[in-house]
Amino acid sequence: MCTGGCARCLGGTLIPLAVFGLLANILLFFPGGKVVNDKSHLSDEVWYFGGILGSGVLMIFPALVFLGLQNNDCCGCCGNEGCGKRFAMFTSTLFAVIGFLGAGYSFIVSAVSINKGPKCFMANGTWGYPFHDGDYLKDQALWSECEEPRDVVPWNLTLFSILLVIGGIQMVLCAIQVINGLLGTLCGDCQCCGCCGGDGPV
């Protein structure tokens, strides 16, 4: 597969992942599927916008750049080899790095939140974090320490786990595009197939 075709494939995969990341982060603002009257009762990590910024917005731009490579024919700008493919592939590499950093941010925020557990109303009548060092992950009986919002533990655990997986996949895809983009920049893309009268690598 040509490096441009590979980039387009990666871009098409990143778009739905970014959308799912956005949705997962938005749902975290409704712990247990309920509206919270006091925003301070939400877990701190929800406000870090890992899914909205990291896996969402910062991933949309690289994905669009990767998909935009389909507008560059493999001869550059209609036979002008000086503009087009190599520069486009180099630019996609820079955006892939941005995407990797965004996905990494979302991945780290999600991992920290999963280990920390959700903020909830505890038996002592205060709001806080009843779990320590991910102990609730091994002992589901501890989940009862969170009295409100109801089902906040599985809610946060599920959504942050989704963000963790999405962030991990996005990091891998962006890393692949960094390598792919460098290959496209240094070695050129596919052989031209008669487009604009050209016949050779760009």
Swiss-Prot record:
Predominant subcellular localization, coarse grouping: membrane
Any GO CC annotation of this UniProt entry: membrane
Membrane spanning residue stretches: 10-30, 49-69, 94-114, 159-179
Cysteine-cysteine disulfides: none
Compartments, record wording: Membrane
UniProt keyword annotations, A-Z: Glycoprotein, Membrane, Transmembrane, Transmembrane helix
Extracellular side: 31-48, 115-158
Cytoplasmic side: 1-9, 70-93, 180-202
Function: Regulates the adhesive and proliferative status of intestinal epithelial cells. Can mediate density-dependent cell proliferation.
Similarity field: Belongs to the L6 tetraspanin family.
Record-given protein name: Transmembrane 4 L6 family member 4
Originating species: Mus musculus
Gene expressing this chain: Tm4sf4
